[in-house]
């Protein structure tokens, strides 16, 4: 790989800004926080150079265009699918062509589920085709389907109160949308709770903050000792319509057909690339997003955007001829949508070196206009991150909020490694999440430029500071 020896922006020699004196004695920092603040402030011109390149310079729109090429070419990338395998191989080649270092694939085993053909039709009180999306890991119905009367409930509590009515029926959940973290339990646990009271299947109102007759899929979980029943999500509109019908005392009958099957686990890979550290190469700042998606839409928002701004962060740093003291590592996870399967296998493989991880970063809540970071770590680490984020004042992206957790980095965070997630405008995120609407049309190249600049500045500065982030 070639690195630029000199890079000038506004007459400033970037590499001179990266030099730092040794501040360790017997492994203990002797610096005051004011000295740390001064060190971070010295990266101001580096941050401006990254911002200029990403937002206004030759690299603007690059992450968007790279992403569009992949998702238009490959499409959705379900765990275990040929599409995911193809995307991984394409990204492996892309990272090599980008002249990043130590590009490699780390193998693992991941779930392989396919939805097959599926349909739902209301037979009573009138004929009405119901849009559905089967949920990940659901079983299928018999070939002839399941035809049964419907019981509509709005909560698990109501289901328990009406348990005697549920046997032999299809339970329809019309739970209100509060927020994703509180409402998603109906998607993940709806089938189990319905099966406990003798239901034949469950249909769940999509976990969406807005709907234009769009079902949203996602993972669901069975429980040992509880019968497994078919389960799918339906649109907000159909859930509300059936709730209104039921409140009038009208009998509702649905025929449900699902061809879903689970196959043996299959081979897959986490995709890795680096810029090797100049002084502490064994120490790591990790940036990441997941390459897999659900099998609807294009997986552009979830999580193509996060994966591609993570790649872009390394590209920007490489293009400026910068080499941080620590290794900056990109990981594109496999099988996140099945519960962080690829990330867990990565953690199991690398946790022996956990003391060398300074910061783990994940972007998996969209790449809309960012306002800052969500961060989990010690108070001292948070104070450092607040100073780092002040470098992004030119973009007005300076917030540091709590809860930096993400599915793929939680393993590290729970073990004490500081973690960060991109904080961006989520207003429209759950309009499109896990639906046919997750396409490149959702993405905004200018917003991706800003997100990539944030990702690059934060990862570079933390990787280049003389000290790792302090832990509790």
From Swiss-Prot:
One GO MF term attached to the UniProt entry: metallodipeptidase activity
Record: glycosylation sites: 61, 179, 353, 356, 396
PTM entry text: N-glycosylated. The secreted form is modified by hybrid or complex type oligosaccharide chains.
CDD domains in the record: M28_Pgcp_like (cd03883)
Organism domain of life: Eukaryota
Pfam families membership: Peptidase_M28
EC number of the protein: 3.4.17.-
GO cellular component: a single term: extracellular space
Record's subcellular location: Endoplasmic reticulum; Golgi apparatus; Lysosome; Secreted
GO BP term, pick one: peptide catabolic process
InterPro entries the record matches: CPQ, Peptidase_M28
Signal peptide: 1-20
Active site (UniProt): 336 (nucleophile)
Keywords per UniProt: Carboxypeptidase, Endoplasmic reticulum, Glycoprotein, Golgi apparatus, Hydrolase, Lysosome, Metal-binding, Metalloprotease, Protease, Secreted, Signal, Zinc, Zymogen
Binding site for Zn(2+) 2: 302, 337, 434
Propeptide stretch(es), residue numbers: 21-44
Binding annotation for Zn(2+) 1: 290, 302, 364
Family (UniProt): Belongs to the peptidase M28 family.
Annotated function: Carboxypeptidase that may play an important role in the hydrolysis of circulating peptides. Catalyzes the hydrolysis of dipeptides with unsubstituted terminals into amino acids. May play a role in the liberation of thyroxine hormone from its thyroglobulin (Tg) precursor.
Assembly behavior: Homodimer. The monomeric form is inactive while the homodimer is active.
UniProt protein name: Carboxypeptidase Q
């Amino acid at each position: 790989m070639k690195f630029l020896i000199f890079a000038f922006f506004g007459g400033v020699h970037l590499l001179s800004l990266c030099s730092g004196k040794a501040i360790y004695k017997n492994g203990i920092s002797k610096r005051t926080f004011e000295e740390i603040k001064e060190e971070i402030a010295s990266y101001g011109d580096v941050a401006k150079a990254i911002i200029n390149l990403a937002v206004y310079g030759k690299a603007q729109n690059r992450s968007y265009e790279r992403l569009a090429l992949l998702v238009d070419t490959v499409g959705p990338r379900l765990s275990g699918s040929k599409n995911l395998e193809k995307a991984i191989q394409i990204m492996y080649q892309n990272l090599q062509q980008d002249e990043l270092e130590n590009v490699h694939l780390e193998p693992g085993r991941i779930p392989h589920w396919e939805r097959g053909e599926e349909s739902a039709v209301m037979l009573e009180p009138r004929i009405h085709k119901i849009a559905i999306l089967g949920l990940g890991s659901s079983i299928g119905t018999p070939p002839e389907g399941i035809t049964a009367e419907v019981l509509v409930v709005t909560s698990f509590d109501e289901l328990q109160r009406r348990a005697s009515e549920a046997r032999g029926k299809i339970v329809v959940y019309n739970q209100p949308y509060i927020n994703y973290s509180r409402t998603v339990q109906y998607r993940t646990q709806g089938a189990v709770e319905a099966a406990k009271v003798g239901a034949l299947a469950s249909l769940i109102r999509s976990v969406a903050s807005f709907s234009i007759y769009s079902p949203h899929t996602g993972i669901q979980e069975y429980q040992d000792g509880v019968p497994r029943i078919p389960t799918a999500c339906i649109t907000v509109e159909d859930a509300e319509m059936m709730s209104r019908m039921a409140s009038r005392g009208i009998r509702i009958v649905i025929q449900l057909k699902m061809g879903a099957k689970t196959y043996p686990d299959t081979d897959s890979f986490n995709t890795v690339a680096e810029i090797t550290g100049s002084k502490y190469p064994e120490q790591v700042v990790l940036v990441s997003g997941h390459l897999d998606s659900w099998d609807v839409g294009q997986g552009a928002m979830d999580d193509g955007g996060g994966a591609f701004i993570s790649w872009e962060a390394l590209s920007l740093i490489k293009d400026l001829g910068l080499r941080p003291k620590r290794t900056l590592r990109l990981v594109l996870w496999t099988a996140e949508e099945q519960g962080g399967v690829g990330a867990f296998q990565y953690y199991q493989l690398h946790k022996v070196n956990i003391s060398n991880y300074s910061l783990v970063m994940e972007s998996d809540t969209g790449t809309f206009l960012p306002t800052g970071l969500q961060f989990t770590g010690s108070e001292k680490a948070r104070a450092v991150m607040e100073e780092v984020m002040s470098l992004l004042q030119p973009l007005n992206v300076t917030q540091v909020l709590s809860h930096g957790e993400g599915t793929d980095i939680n393993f590290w965070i729970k073990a004490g490694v500081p973690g960060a997630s991109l904080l961006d405008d989520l207003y429209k995120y759950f309009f499109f999440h896990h639906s046919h609407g997750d396409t490149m049309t959702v993405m905004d190249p200018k917003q991706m430029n800003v997100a990539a600049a944030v990702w690059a500045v934060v990862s570079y500065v933390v990787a280049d500071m003389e000290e790792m982030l302090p832990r509790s």
